[in-house]
Amino acid sequence: MKLLVTGGAGYVGSVAAAVLLEHGHDVTIIDNFSTGNREAVPADARLIEGDVNDVVEEVLSEGGFEGVVHFAARSLVGESVEKPNEYWHDNVVTALTLLDAMRAHGVNNLVFSSTAATYGEPDVVPITEDMPTQPTNAYGATKLSIDYAITSYAAAFGLAATSLRYFNVAGAYGNIGENREVETHLIPLVLQVATGHREKTFMFGDDWPTPDGTAVRDYIHILDLAKAHVLALESNEAGKHRIFNLGSGDGYSVKQVVEMCREVTGHPIPAEVAPRRAGDPATLIASSEKAKQELGWTPEHTDLRTIVEDAWAFTSALGDRSHAAKKKA
């Protein structure tokens, strides 16, 4: 298929683009590089630099596109609380612009990068797709709003669509991994201590109702996540909007992640306990049974050591090319 991938220079988007290319698809990427990395763009992909709102109409007007994978979005939870106006514009307005351009040019196949943040603070785990959606921040709220929009476009206009709600994406695929200027994810933050770009890491709360007192999360390997996008694109049905949770189904605590990073890197990695962060749930674990049954998707890299080893191979190879190193310099 001839595909458009928005945000294809980002962490998840670039790996998904690479995997789509490996499966024989023709990939065009739109990215404005507000957070993406040029080095992450697959060599065989066509790149168009620009904002989706500004260029998507012209790109799709070329004709021949058979599907879209939409990653382009703001995705920092804390920032979304401080700047909700920017999130509502950059996430929701952009998605609506894309949906209307797709409709205008007869592109009827969509996979949308949604998030577990749509669920907010769940009362029970594992989280299934039929649980209440109660986002606690603008990031989750904007993604949920886009999910609603996609549902209505599917019903009214016959759009074939899938929303994939990611849990904690981690790991690396070859020379593509997490290398953001503003890092918020646990594993890359901890590994930056091992590379000397940070003095220590923080554990936000050690009094959670979990086995070791630290928060528990479900980590999904980036390659497993990318493969789910391929399966979704190749099985979408007109007039239907499917929603799937994507996680490993296993939970690891912050302490377990820090200790695994110590084992893999051979670095002591000082970890300091800090106060809990408002809005953080004690435990977030996905049920991906629906994706396994309906998509035929099964995560293959669920072991925490494998995820950390892949992330460390990428992080340690970055050296002074990392955002952390550039900022320090």
Curated annotation (Swiss-Prot):
- This entry's Enzyme Commission designation comes to 5.1.3.2
Q: What does this protein do?
A: Involved in the metabolism of galactose. Catalyzes the conversion of UDP-galactose (UDP-Gal) to UDP-glucose (UDP-Glc) through a mechanism involving the transient reduction of NAD.
Question: What is its cofactor?
Answer: NAD(+)
Please give the subunit comment from the record.
Homodimer.
Q: Which family does it belong to?
A: Belongs to the NAD(P)-dependent epimerase/dehydratase family.
Protein's UniProt keywords contain Isomerase = yes
State the UniProt keywords alphabetically. Carbohydrate metabolism, Galactose metabolism, Isomerase, NAD
Reactions this protein catalyses:
UDP-alpha-D-glucose = UDP-alpha-D-galactose
Residues noted as binding substrate in the record, renumbered to the chain: 115, 139, 168, 185-186, 202-204, 217, 277-280
What is this protein's record name? UDP-glucose 4-epimerase
Organism field: Corynebacterium glutamicum (strain ATCC 13032 / DSM 20300 / JCM 1318 / BCRC 11384 / CCUG 27702 / LMG 3730 / NBRC 12168 / NCIMB 10025 / NRRL B-2784 / 534)
Q: Any idea which positions bind NAD(+)?
A: 11-12, 31-36, 51-52, 71-75, 115, 139, 143, 167
Q: Where is the active site?
A: 139
UniProt pathway? Carbohydrate metabolism; galactose metabolism
List, in alphabetical order, the Gene Ontology terms for molecular function in this entry: UDP-glucose 4-epimerase activity
Q: Which Gene3D superfamilies match?
A: NAD(P)-binding Rossmann-like Domain, UDP-galactose 4-epimerase, domain 1
Which is a GO BP term held by this UniProt record?
galactose catabolic process via UDP-galactose, Leloir pathway
